[in-house]
Each structure stands twice: as structure tokens, then as C-alpha cells.
């Protein structure tokens, strides 16, 4: 039984060996799947958002626990509600019935056995839309294999290939090695496939996408990289690897949205805040500036990837979520279908 893997948990490279039927692992979670919210999200890459929005399920807990995480309320502070496999399946179906283009599972690496069971039940109940796996790529291949045949779209991060940064920021010096292996596996198990879809309400589509038609992803891999301010050379390392190993096999998504998230002793203990601040000294904890963005644009031209998305530079922070609220994101970015603190 898949869930027996929780007894001596080695699902992720932390290999903490905890019996998660009895207590929490490094990820902060037990064997029970916990979810913060389910939304129609319109802020993902265009082929994932498509026209109806991505049916995004934000899971509680995380096996990486980055010091700069914008979702710290759910990734590190345990906010969420426990769901059974059938309840999880019903949430997937609810997102589909509300027009979601896919089911987008955010940060579920530590819940893979329970998620696999839930997805199997959802498909038996009639789930037809693609399933998207949205993760840090800090994952063991043995765990990912449980998702083979259940996931259609892989959306991993490649956060850094600098072991010093990964050690200092998320206490995982082996992250570069692990992420490369996981992403290679994802590319081997999914082929890029798109279909053209047209919006009946042309005005809404043109406003959001600039066109009444869009290419929707059916399967494949999109590899994300968040540029850290002051560490453009690290981004070049990542792009070098991606050019050599992923160009033409996956889409590349460069993100410029790094945003300082302020926390207080209401959120974390004094010791946790001190540890967090020490980790953040590895780079410049600020918004990206125009010079850095220009450098990124030059790198985009230099590497000339076959499939690449990038974010425009902005100082807007309205997109930062608050998972205490029924609508964690702005109304423009998402529509909540289910929330841990009550349905509406």
C-alpha cells in the first residue's frame, strides 16, 4: 500500500525517517493530506492558465522551506484542513466543473502517496482535465514514480545550481544534484503537447491574453527559475544547464517576481526569525532592479531557447497571498472554489 511509505519516511531527499502516522516530518506534516485552498488561478504561465484558469490546489507543508517563501503561512506554519482521499478527489472534480483547464497541485512532494490515491479516485469518478505537478524538484525518483500515469504536466522549479546558496537558503546542499535528476526524469516521462483553444467571449480573452485564441498545454514540462536579486551569475549557471539538457524538450519560465516578505514574532519565534535573516544574507533581499532585468533580457536573447516565458518587471506586491482570507489572491488573479476556513 502506498501509504505505508509514511512509516519510515524517505519520500524526499531529507530522509528524516519519521513515522508520519505518529508525528510530523521535516515537512511539518503527518500522513494526512492537508490543503489550504483550491482556486481558479489566472497567474500561471499562459499555456497552464489558458482560458478558464488553472485549478490550483495549495497543499500545506513543504520539504524545502525556503527562507524567502511567499506562501510561508501554509508551507511553514501549518495553515490548512485535513482531507480524505475522497474529499481530495471531489475537490479536483469541483475545480473541473467550475471551468478549470487542469488540476494544479502546488508543493505536494511530502504528500505523494496520499495524492496518488486521491488522483486515482478522481479519475475513477470522471476527472478528465490534465493534472499539473507544481514542485520544487527536491524529490526522489522513487516517489515521483508513484505519479507516473497520473500527472500530465510537470512544473518544477530549478531554484539554483549553486550548492552554497541551496545550503544557506534552504539547508539542502544537495538540491542542485537532486533537482537535475528529478527534472531529467520528468522530461523523460512527458512530451510537449498543446492544443489551440478559442474563447467564446472574445473581449475577456483579449483583455487577459491579447488574443481570442491561446495554446493550452496538454502535457509536457515547464521549468521555472526565480531570479534572485544580486545573483545573476547563478541564473546564468541555470540557463547553461537548461540550454544543454532541456532546450526543445521543455518550456523555460524565468520569473522576476522576487519580493521581500516581512514576518514578525506573531508568525515566527525570535530564533526562527534570526535563522531566516541569516539565510537571506546570501543574496540581496529586495525587488529586482531595472539593470538586472536588462541583464536577464540580454541572457534571454543570448540563449535563444525554443520555448521560453518571462515576467515583466514590476514593483507591484498586490499579488502576495494571505491564506487567512477566503480569497488569498486578488480578484484579478484568482477565484476561490474551496478554502480551509470555510466554503462559500
Model-derived segments and spans:
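Conserved Radical SAM active-site core
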Residues: 23, 27-149, 153-154, 162-163, ...
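Hydrophobic faces of well-ordered beta-strands that scaffold small-molecule active sites
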Residues: 55, 103, 131-133, 154-156, ...
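Alpha-helix-loop-beta-strand connector modules within alpha/beta enzyme cores
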Residues: 118-132, 181-189, 292-298
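Glycine-rich S-adenosyl-L-methionine
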Residues: 173-191, 203
Amino acid at each position: 500500500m502506498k501509504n505505508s511509505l509514511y512509516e519510515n519516511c524517505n519520500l524526499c531527499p531529507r530522509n528524516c525517517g519519521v513515522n508520519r502516522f505518529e508525528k510530523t516530518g521535516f515537512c511539518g506534516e503527518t500522513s494526512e493530506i492537508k490543503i489550504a485552498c483550491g482556486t481558479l488561478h489566472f497567474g500561471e504561465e499562459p499555456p497552464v492558465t489558458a482560458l478558464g484558469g488553472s485549478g490550483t490546489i495549495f497543499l500545506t507543508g513543504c520539504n524545502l522551506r525556503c527562507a524567502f517563501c511567499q506562501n510561508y503561512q501554509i508551507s511553514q506554519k501549518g495553515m490548512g484542513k485535513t482531507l480524505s482521499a475522497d474529499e481530495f478527489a471531489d475537490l479536483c472534480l469541483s475545480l473541473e466543473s467550475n471551468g478549470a483547464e487542469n488540476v494544479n497541485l502546488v508543493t505536494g512532494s511530502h504528500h505523494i502517496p496520499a495524492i496518488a490515491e486521491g488522483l486515482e479516485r478522481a479519475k475513477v469518478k470522471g476527472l478528465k482535465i490534465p493534472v499539473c505537478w507544481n514542485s520544487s524538484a527536491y524529490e526522489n525518483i522513487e516517489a515521483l514514480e508513484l505519479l507516473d500515469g497520473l500527472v500530465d504536466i510537470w512544473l518544477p522549479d530549478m531554484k539554483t545550481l549553486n550548492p552554497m546558496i541551496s545550503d544557506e537558503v534552504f539547508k539542502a546542499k544537495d538540491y542542485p544534484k537532486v533537482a537535475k535528476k528529478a527534472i531529467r526524469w520528468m522530461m523523460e516521462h512527458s512530451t510537449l503537447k498543446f492544443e489551440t483553444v478559442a474563447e467564446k467571449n472574445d473581449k475577456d480573452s483579449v483583455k487577459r491574453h491579447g488574443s481570442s485564441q491561446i495554446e493550452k498545454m496538454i502535457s509536457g514540462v515547464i521549468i521555472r527559475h526565480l531570479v534572485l536579486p544580486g545573483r545573476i551569475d547563478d541564473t546564468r549557471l541555470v540557463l547553461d544547464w537548461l540550454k544543454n539538457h532541456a532546450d526543445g524538450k521543455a518550456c523555460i519560465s524565468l520569473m522576476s517576481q522576487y519580493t521581500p516578505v516581512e514576518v514578525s514574532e506573531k508568525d515566527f519565534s525570535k530564533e526562527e526569525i534570526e535563522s531566516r535573516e541569516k539565510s537571506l544574507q546570501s543574496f540581496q533581499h529586495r525587488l529586482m532592479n531595472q539593470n538586472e532585468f536588462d541583464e536577464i533580457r540580454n541572457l534571454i536573447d543570448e540563449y535563444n531557447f525554443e520555448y521560453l516565458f518571462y515576467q515583466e518587471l514590476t514593483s507591484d506586491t498586490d499579488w502576495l497571498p494571505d491564506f487567512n482570507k477566503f480569497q488569498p489572491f486578488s480578484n484579478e488573479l484568482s477565484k476561490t472554489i474551496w478554502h480551509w476556513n470555510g466554503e462559500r
